[in-house]
Amino acid sequence: VTTSGPLQPGLVYETRTTDYLNYLCYIGLDIDGIKAIAKTIPNDFACPKDSNSDYVSNINYPSIAISKFDGKASKNISRTVTNVGGDGKTVYAVSVDAPSGIVVKVIPDQLTFTKNNEKLSYQVIFSSSTATSLKEDVFGSITWTNGKFKVRSPFVVSSKSGDNDEYVL
């Protein structure tokens, strides 16, 4: 990834072809359905065995959409970021702006990069502080900061299922 000047983001979320293909699996398409709309598919690609719409949130985008949140079970997602800040060694600390009733935990709470273009992953765990389902969609954000860059990832948590072809990233 090459970035410079005012478009320098600090961290980037790279999304690969397999991320998009997995997304199609998660929303219910099989290999034949994917081949009908995708120009090229890697020869070794197969839909994950446990594909279902619960995994739509795992596409490696900066934004996060959690559906079917009933307040009883936590929802876990993971993200991978690439350090493109140009400083090589740097540490990003996380801050979370969570809506009332939602607990958001980020693991780890710091990303320590030792070089440019290094990739690190983190996990976000969404749980309810009230153990009840949501009455409406709620919004918040996760922000990674190293003193030079702020990288914000907005999120939405919904009790809706998304089963009506309303898949949002």
Mark where each language-model region is.
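Loop-rich non-cytosolic ectodomains and luminal regions
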Residues: V1-L169
